[in-house]
Amino acid sequence: MPPSPAPLRSKRVARAAVALLAVVAAGCAVTPAKEFEHSTFEGFDVVSYVPDQPRGLVYLFHGSNGSAAFAERVESTDVLNRLIGQGYGFVSTSSTERTGDRRWEVGSSSTTANPDLARLARLHTHLVNTTAVAASTPVVGIGMSNGARFVTLWGQVWKNAGYPVKAIWASMGRIAGPGAAPGALTVPTVFSTAVNDFTVPPGPIVTNFVDTQEAGTPTELYFSQERDLRPVPYLRIPGIDRSEADQIVDALVATGVWNAAGERIVRDIQQAAAQAVTAQFPPSVAGQLGAISDETALQMAVHQFTAEHVGKVQAFFDRYVPR
């Protein structure tokens, strides 16, 4: 029998803490290690980087209300930097749905009827024809929330179609409906969730992990833990200095969610999250409010993409992508 979710979590807490310290300890702004290319394909934005001899190609899928620019958010950039350093290229584009929730289509596994799957196949052909990506270049996928559901659909459909899909990372999301039956997902998969996520609660993700593991598909499950409010994570945001990071923390403490020691004192996590958004930040950081919100959500361990697991994800990918 697989281990229960509680032991899984407890066994990983210490390792997660070490990895997290490695991510944030330096307090340095996260910027692209290589220049990202901005282009369009069939009218949709594309952000990408392809080295001369790519070891593999990462497809990055945003969550609801997202776009190709997901690649340029602090945590995404940190993840991509790590993988680029290991020889990968990446591509990030936007979902076909550009109104409403701007989500990926996760209800259909048809490579023709599903507009996202169809366009991504054409985009891949374009990359093979115009960059150093070859038809045989190993492919991995990373998705957040709705993008996590989509990466499970895309990964399995592409694997079934003969594409060299080697592994995927589903962050803060469940397996998409067409592949949700136990044993249907055969692509090696990392699942990750956060202990306080009330948008996509951990329970169903844990169930997906257990079902995938019992079916014999290589899989791992990572949890993000809540941590005390500190200024260091905000130093990861380009343009924010230590004085501003301290002011950000002061503004968040002033909402009443945390005490002066950075400990959350509003017990209900949904109330705490709603209260935190009322913070009045200094005018000098007005252009970075989205990134501030992201880093705050990470400390609260709610629904947010995180780079804290990138070392483990890279090691997982390494098992299936040759050097």
Model-derived segments and their meaning:
Residues 31-50:
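N-terminal cap/lid segment of alpha/beta-hydrolase-fold proteins
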Residues 55-63:
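Short beta-strand element of the alpha/beta-hydrolase
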Residues 72-88:
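Short amphipathic alpha-helix adjacent to the substrate-entry channel of hydrolases
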Residues 92-115:
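Cap/lid segment of the alpha/beta-hydrolase catalytic domain
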Residues 107-131:
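Alpha/beta-hydrolase active-site loop
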Residues 136-186:
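Primarily recognizes the serine-hydrolase "nucleophile elbow" in alpha/beta-hydrolase
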Residues 166-249:
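The feature captures the conserved acid-bearing segment of alpha/beta-hydrolase catalytic domains
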Residues 217-323:
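C-terminal catalytic histidine-bearing segment of alpha/beta-hydrolase fold enzymes
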